[in-house]
Amino acid sequence: MKRDKHCFDVTEEGLEMDGAFVAPFYPVLREKRLIHTQSPQKVRKEYHIYVKLADGSELGTHTFTSINNIRYSEYWDECCDAELTSTARKGLQIFLQHIVMQQEYVVCYEVERLGLCMVEPVIFIYGYRKAIVPDGINILFSSQVPIVSDEGKQGNIQELLYYAKRLITLRPGITDILFYVRILGVLRPLLEETGCPADFFVGLFGASGTQKSTYAKLFFAEDSAQFLSFSSYNGKQILKRVEQYSGHIVVVDDYHPLAKKYDREKQQSALDAIARNADSGQGALVVITGEFMEGCFSLQDRMIQISVPKSTTDGYVLSKELQQLQCQKDMLGSLVYEFAQKVYGNFDKMKEQTQKLFLQQENNIYTFRIERNIKFLVVAIRLFEICFPEISAWGIEKQLETSLKSVLENQKKHMDIVRRLEYDKDWTREVFLMLSSPGFKRKYEFSKTASDMNEIIVEGDRIYITEMVLEREMGRFLECRVKSSDISEHLSKTQVLEEDQSLARTKKKNGIRYYVISRSRLKLYYLSTVSRDK
């Protein structure tokens, strides 16, 4: 081997240069890499080198970012280059440079997270063993990439689609929407590149026992690291997980601010962080669960709110079906990966198709963001139909249309209430509407037992209601969290609340403290607001 004036040879004793002995070992280049990093976008070089001894035995491979002045004894104990002369060390350096020049670089792309890591070339990472990359592209995983359960259940596409149909038709109005929220999670990186970022998050709300967490685990939490809770994680920890799981969904379970000030503020702060981060349209799509919707108008407007009422069907049958679907949920992961392959394997075509679908939507001026956000679910449905035209035979178009309309109308109604409460705060009017609503339960006499504190009692012109019941019933009526202190303050200002000389807002009767509301004054106040609005 010749390069310039040097000639190298490997003998039984080791490496020779120009006929002179250099060392009883010599380096061998296994591979040299040119690595494109994702963040920051830079290029670095790596050299994978091992050592051969004179007897032909090989020592382990080590990675170097530079081949200059390698101290072999630091990496391979069998090498004694410290005892070599400067001429011999120089000979090893020249030999290494020579063999490096003889080999071509292997171009690699290093990824640091899941989701769409690079657009040119298109690299979409679903999990460690499931990556969508063009042929001939080499990828490396950095230590930052989270490990996800991406084995999935291998089966033909018809089996996977049948499982999806079972999910969608399980509980129309809930499970069909949740399925397409999962699809939307995969599409989020594409939407960002399309210029239509999905800048919102999803809220799953319902009373205790409505199986919100069960639905969330079934549809969204492919890996345990994707299922967080408001009580155990703060906003910073949640956002870090959101950044890691791009192209997936992160669930934050059980929004339920506790009585303790610290817990309450921690959960509220985490919810606020999720809402602010949603504006970027980057990272994982966040799904939260909770018993009620809370927060200012701006925060709630950034949500797609899905209500989960108690099932009218046999609870045992529904739970059994959910359990069966949960045991097979790896089929959903496999189907979603098949969908991701079709989308990110034909990136330019799907990007163009997505833009067309958004242009086909009506661009009306909207009052609430849900009127715009619901269009993202429509696009998700259409793209899924394009990728899997077989589902047109299911005959669920009307069901999906009804479900989307229900989500839209329910949230518009709720947001109208939130806006009215935030900006008008006419609690006295709301109390009248609550007490006058159809089916509202009340008693017309005291039982003089402890059960009275859980009831609304009407006695003549007076309405007796405890602080706890006022908060509970108004919260149910408005479908949001309220404070009795805000309501009682407004009732006092409008002179609807009966007060004595002590100015205490509650009065004791039969050992229980009640707010005492005058029915006649309450009705007069409401009628005055109606005439004022006209």
Please annotate each region the language model reported:
Residues 267-280:
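Conserved catalytic/switch belt of AAA+ P-loop NTPases
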Residues 136-225:
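P-loop NTPase catalytic core of nucleic-acid-dependent motor ATPases
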Residues 283-291, 304-307:
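Structural recognition of the conserved hydrophobic beta-strand(s) that form the central parallel beta-sheet
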Residues 246-249, 281-286:
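Loop/turn-to-beta-strand initiation segments
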Residues 297-391, 397:
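Phosphate-sensing "switch" segment of ASCE/P-loop ATPases
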Residues 1-173, 240-248, 264, 299-301, ...:
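Conserved glycine-centered beta->alpha loop in an early N-terminal alpha/beta scaffold
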Residues 203-205, 214-264:
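AAA+/P-loop NTPase substrate/partner-engagement loops
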Residues 118-158, 163-167, 350-534:
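DNA transaction DNA-binding modules
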